[in-house]
């Protein structure tokens, strides 16, 4: 696969009220920081979030394809349905030897019944599909180099505590993970977007900058010319 303009890691995990995702807004041409303000977190349906890393044009193609498919069928599609649709689209492209260079996080709330029709609960669904159409489900999902740099950090902070983490703490964990990536991934930036889905629906923030401190990279005997 040839890359042109790409986006790096998406981080996502389950928390008490739903699913949260974070991604930076840089579009990289190789190692060149070519674009800023690139959206990589999208709302589809009424209870589903998509976070994508990989080729920017392939992200746009996938969102357009999902929009066309859902307009042709008025039935409500839940997060599991979108996950299956995306898996089929990516697997089909791979089978035609023209894969989409994408890793997609799919998260949302499914309406699930516990057996009593009068009682309904909300099932938190979080999964990932890669460019080959392979997929898995987990409490914590990171795409790209984030699977090496921040996945262990988030697993340590999140796993076993999913029902204890409030939204404010979840946003703080996403920001800390994105800060780690900004320090260690040359294609990441400190301008990020955070999206979450809960019982009130899907919410995606405007891009904003997180604080970073590069003093750790200075030596005491180093002379800095200002």
UniProtKB/Swiss-Prot annotation:
Alphabetical UniProt keywords: Cytoplasm, Nucleus, Proteasome
A single GO cellular-component term on record: cytoplasm
InterPro entries: Ntn_hydrolases_N, Proteasome_beta4, Proteasome_bsu_CS, Proteasome_sua/b, Proteasome_suB-type
Pfam families reported for this sequence: Proteasome
Predominant subcellular localization, coarse grouping: cytoplasm
Gene Ontology terms describing biological process: proteolysis involved in protein catabolic process
Stated family: Belongs to the peptidase T1B family.
Name of the molecule in the record: Probable proteasome subunit beta type-7
Gene name of this polypeptide: PRE4
């Amino acid at each position: 696969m040839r890359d042109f303009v790409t986006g790096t890691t998406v981080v996502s995990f389950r928390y008490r009220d739903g699913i949260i995702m974070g991604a930076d807004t840089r579009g990289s041409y190789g190692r060149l920081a070519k674009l800023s303000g690139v959206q990589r977190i999208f709302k589809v349906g009424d209870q589903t979030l998509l976070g994508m890393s990989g080729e920017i044009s392939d992200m746009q193609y996938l969102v357009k394809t999902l929009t066309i498919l859902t307009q042709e069928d008025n039935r409500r599609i839940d997060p599991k349905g979108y996950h299956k649709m995306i898996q089929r689209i990516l697997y089909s492209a791979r089978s035609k030897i023209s894969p989409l260079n994408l890793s997609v996080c799919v998260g949302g709330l499914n309406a699930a019944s516990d057996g009593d029709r009068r009682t309904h609960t909300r099932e938190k669904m979080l999964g990932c599909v890669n460019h080959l159409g392979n997929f898995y489900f987990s409490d914590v999902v990171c795409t790209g180099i984030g699977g090496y740099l921040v996945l262990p950090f988030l697993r340590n902070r999140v796993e076993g505590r999913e029902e204890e983490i409030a939204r404010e703490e979840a946003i703080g964990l996403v920001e800390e993970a994105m800060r780690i990536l900004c320090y260690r991934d040359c294609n990441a930036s400190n301008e990020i977007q955070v999206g979450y889905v809960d019982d009130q629906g899907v919410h995606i923030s405007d891009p904003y900058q997180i604080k970073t401190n590069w003093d750790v990279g200075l030596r005491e005997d180093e002379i800095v010319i200002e």
